[in-house]
Amino acid sequence: MAGNTFMYARNLHKIYRKNAISTPVLKGVDMEVAEGEFLSVVGASGSGKSTLMHLLGSLDKPDAGEIYYREKRIDNLSADKRDHLRNHDFGFIFQFYHLLPELTALENVMIPLMIRSSVFSWLGNGSVARKRAITLMEKVGLGHRMHHLPKELSGGEMQRTAIARALIGNPALLFADEPTGNLDEDTGREIVQLLRELNEIDNVTIIMVTHNLEIARGTHRIIKLVAGHVEVPLQLQPEAFGIVRPESFDNLPEDENHPDETRRQAGI
């Protein structure tokens, strides 16, 4: 059940520069997400969907504008504080799974907790982290695959592992950037159903970037970006937290090739 405003952004601008060429991507974006909400961000290629997610998730900084999380401004934090925020409050899922090939699925899930711990802390609490990782692997339906290497897993199983890894730190806010973009249609539906369950049962707030309107229509609300602007304005009204079906969401392309292709994991 969606609640009070959890994160909001005001007048966000982002420009990518390469040599003498400047490419404005976001041009004054305002948006909000409520606590417990499952929000979709859709738009055409180059509209700024992934850029917006990177800014909200403190993976990048805006050129102008402000971002607030739990009523505290976060876009102007130091690099160390942003790292801490990503590793303790946020979880990230991307189109590509970014699993370390030499580690088992279970070991991949444990990585964020290893990174946030000191050596001595890990020696004392590693078994607790392992138990939580096992619980999450079972939660995403991979209890029987946790000791397999990534190369032994299907695409859907690798994405489920990535979701478990994103949840290991018990994040309050989960960012999902095209989580079904590398999967077949049926597997993609399964992944989105898993995200819905996490939202509804565990009350995880989710911001999802997707080009798939069928998927987007199954979330609480939809924001459409057009040429760096929000075309469908956001209104945080209690009655708006059902499925939204805007009439203007037509003829979107199949994929987005964003100027910034970097896919960094929080704290990794």
PLM feature spans:
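ABC family nucleotide-binding domain
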Residues: 6-225
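Non-catalytic connector elements of ABC transporters
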Residues: 258-268
